[in-house]
Amino acid sequence: MLRILLSAQTSPARLSGLLLIPPVQPCCLGPSKSGDRPFGGGPVQGLQRLLEQARSPGELLRWLSQNPTKVRAHHYPVALRRLGQLLVSQPRPSPVEQATLQDLSQLIIRNCPSFDVHTIHVCLHLAVLLGFPSDGPLLCALEQERRSRLPPKPPSPHRPAIYGGQRLEVALSCPRFLQYPRQHLIRSLAEARPEELTPHVMVLLAQHLARHRLREPQLLEAIAHFLVVQEAQLNSKVVQKLVLPFGRLNYMPLEQQFMPCLERILAREAGVAPLATVNILMSLCQLQCLPFRALQFVFSPSFINHINGTPPSLIVRRYLSLLDTAVELELPGYQGPRLPQRQRVPIFPQPLITDRARCKYSHKDMVAEGLRQLLGEENYRQNLTVPPGYCTDFLLCVSSSGAVLPMRTQDPFLPYPPRSCQQDQANFNSTTQDPAQRVVLMLRERWHFCRDGRVLLGSRALRERHLGLMGYQLLPLPFEELESQRGLPQLKSYLRQKLQALGFRWGPEGG
């Protein structure tokens, strides 16, 4: 024991730390396990003074062992503290005191069951400072008593094993989707049993893919297959959520029964939930797969009269206006009813929500400043909405010779519906003094694409497709090229090269 206490582990600096511990007071140690606690003066406090004034370890042991009726739990920390002070002043105790230290240790071990929790903690702390080994009998006994006083841990609730569809649902319900990469989702889906893939789980998967722009073919094909297999059990409100990622991610599934299945569901459910029906058609519009029969139903007077006055009336009319535009531009063979003119509303009268939410990350202000310095503020329009309601990033009017024309002298809008036959176009050119070309600069920001790919989102591809069919010339500005421009001079040079590639020229007539 002496060798342990005087080893390198018990350095003078460590023992001197005992001097910084304030004297242990009975009132701060709390009641002992048996509930006794000294009050006031008397033999108990007299014994504490004797311990504090002891001149050797033997004297400490004598006061503790010869006064069993007066010794209380708080006296043992006092004795340990005094022992440390004596070891500092007498670094080499005599061989007789080695046995004394062992006896003192055994005395504490025998009586520690009566210590309160606070006394046990103080004794543990002092014993460590004195250098008692961690695997020695004193520290082991004190540590065992400390653990026995801890409140019992509540039994952990039984967590059943999570398999297949349940694990997929847990992953999809987590707000931090990056914790669950697509490989995890694919594996969970592959391990799921057919009965575990409920509509709720598949809707969560579809919403997850659409929200985070994950164009993952394996997962999308699984949704398409589920829709075909469960066709009879699904209503239009569930189907609209299942088909959402296909339109948003511009992905046409390989499942051959996908479109026939949707046409049957639309025929069965079209009059039940008008908004769900139109939402399904919106997704199919982005895929360029509009079924004529469903269009005839939603453009019928009975359907339009049914939605008027209902809460979703405005949003349904906006979607119907977009569907009517798609019929006009993309379905020349359609002969059914169309949306009446009085029911039409602007499709997208302002920048999309995602663009407004991420405006501080957009390159639009930078491009606008470059165009202002390159062309002049009067020679372009920003955020101009053209019929039938598409918001353009930047619009220019260019003469047949390639000169950029001032916007104040031009009508920025092309006629809608566009003139389709050559005779109408010839009549238009002969009666119009300004055959200027309308050029739309399209910003393609990072969030306009599916994640980790070069496929435009369905709504972006639809807008560009319709503007092109209406006669506007499109000039895409990809985010990779914009991000590589360092400073305004480089950006102006980049824009000049882009415009010159379309036949623009700078001279007396233009910018």
From Swiss-Prot:
<comment type="function">
    <text>Phosphorylates the splicing regulator TIA1, thereby promoting the inclusion of FAS exon 6, which leads to an mRNA encoding a pro-apoptotic form of the receptor. Required for the biogenesis of some mitochondrial-encoded mRNAs, specifically stabilizes ND6 (NADH dehydrogenase complex subunit 6) mRNA, and regulates its levels.</text>
</comment>
<dbReference type="InterPro" id="IPR013584">
    <property type="entry name" value="RAP"/>
</dbReference>
<feature type="domain" description="RAP">
    <location>
        <begin position="439"/>
        <end position="497"/>
    </location>
</feature>
<keyword id="KW-0547">Nucleotide-binding</keyword>
<keyword id="KW-0496">Mitochondrion</keyword>
<dbReference type="GO" id="GO:0044528">
    <property type="term" value="P:regulation of mitochondrial mRNA stability"/>
</dbReference>
<dbReference type="GO" id="GO:0016607">
    <property type="term" value="C:nuclear speck"/>
</dbReference>
<dbReference type="Pfam" id="PF06743">
    <property type="entry name" value="FAST_1"/>
</dbReference>
<comment type="subunit">
    <text>Interacts with TIA1; the interactions leads to TIA1 phosphorylation. Interacts with TIAR.</text>
</comment>
<protein>
    <recommendedName>
        <fullName>Fas-activated serine/threonine kinase</fullName>
        <ecNumber>2.7.11.1</ecNumber>
        <ecNumber>2.7.11.8</ecNumber>
    </recommendedName>
</protein>
<dbReference type="Pfam" id="PF08373">
    <property type="entry name" value="RAP"/>
</dbReference>
<dbReference type="GO" id="GO:0033867">
    <property type="term" value="F:Fas-activated serine/threonine kinase activity"/>
</dbReference>
<comment type="similarity">
    <text>Belongs to the FAST protein kinase family.</text>
</comment>
<dbReference type="GO" id="GO:0006915">
    <property type="term" value="P:apoptotic process"/>
</dbReference>
<keyword id="KW-0808">Transferase</keyword>
<dbReference type="InterPro" id="IPR010622">
    <property type="entry name" value="FAST_Leu-rich"/>
</dbReference>
<dbReference type="GO" id="GO:0003723">
    <property type="term" value="F:RNA binding"/>
</dbReference>
<keyword id="KW-0067">ATP-binding</keyword>
<dbReference type="Pfam" id="PF08368">
    <property type="entry name" value="FAST_2"/>
</dbReference>
<dbReference type="GO" id="GO:0106310">
    <property type="term" value="F:protein serine kinase activity"/>
</dbReference>
<dbReference type="InterPro" id="IPR013579">
    <property type="entry name" value="FAST_2"/>
</dbReference>
<keyword id="KW-0723">Serine/threonine-protein kinase</keyword>
<dbReference type="GO" id="GO:0005739">
    <property type="term" value="C:mitochondrion"/>
</dbReference>
<dbReference type="InterPro" id="IPR050870">
    <property type="entry name" value="FAST_kinase"/>
</dbReference>
<keyword id="KW-0694">RNA-binding</keyword>
<keyword id="KW-0597">Phosphoprotein</keyword>
<keyword id="KW-0053">Apoptosis</keyword>
<keyword id="KW-0418">Kinase</keyword>
<dbReference type="GO" id="GO:0005759">
    <property type="term" value="C:mitochondrial matrix"/>
</dbReference>
<dbReference type="GO" id="GO:0005524">
    <property type="term" value="F:ATP binding"/>
</dbReference>
